[in-house]
Amino acid sequence: MLKVNKYVILIIAFVSQMMFSTTAQASFSATVSDAWSTLSNNVTQTWQAPEHYDLYVPVITWHARFAYDQEKIDNYNERPWGAGFGMSRWDEKGNWNGLYLMAFKDSFNKWEPIVGYGWEKTWRPLADDNFHLGLGYTLGVTARDNWNYIPLPVILPMASVGYGPATFQMTYIPGTYNNGNVYFAWLRFQF
């Protein structure tokens, strides 16, 4: 009798795990599907009905000093000369959506293009609605000289502070020792 109970318990445990796993999988699939739908709708709406056209001006790259040998720091470019163009809109929740194309001088002083989509949750904490803060992400594709200009996908965090049509946007490229760990910022002017 005791052996039968062990088998019954094992079967019940196995079946319940399978049921839970199937439910969790369905929930995860629905979440991914909803996220993809939201992203593609935001990109499409920004492309088809932009409120603004944007000028991008890269202003700084900074290599985290704790993550690099001094010799590398001394040889890196931290003035990312370049420019970019984009289109953007504020959605019904007041959040920023933008499509952009930018080219700038990378750490090795070689041209690096990037094209992508950015989204920021936007807060207007002051009585003056012109002042805004943002926190979000960017998805895009870049290409670098040291990777033979092979297209590389990027998913990066993004933050901003702005007043009216001028916004200081930034990201951080994570990495390992002597690779990545770069703060990159640019000015964005809306027209």
UniProtKB/Swiss-Prot annotation:
The record marks 72 as: Role in lipopolysaccharide recognition. GO terms for molecular function: acyltransferase activity. The keyword Acyltransferase applies. InterPro entries: LipidA_acyl_PagP (IPR009746), OMP/PagP_b-brl (IPR011250). SUPFAM superfamilies: OMPA-like. It is found in: Cell outer membrane. It catalyses: a lipid A + a 1,2-diacyl-sn-glycero-3-phosphocholine = a hepta-acyl lipid A + a 2-acyl-sn-glycero-3-phosphocholine; a lipid IVA + a 1,2-diacyl-sn-glycero-3-phosphocholine = a lipid IVB + a 2-acyl-sn-glycero-3-phosphocholine; a lipid IIA + a 1,2-diacyl-sn-glycero-3-phosphocholine = a lipid IIB + a 2-acyl-sn-glycero-3-phosphocholine. Pfam families: PagP. Its EC number is 2.3.1.251. Residues 1-26 form the signal peptide. The keyword Acetylation does not apply. Homodimer. NCBIfam families: PRK11045.1. Transfers a fatty acid residue from the sn-1 position of a phospholipid to the N-linked hydroxyfatty acid chain on the proximal unit of lipid A or its precursors. This is Lipid A acyltransferase PagP. It comes from Enterobacter lignolyticus (strain SCF1). The gene is pagP.
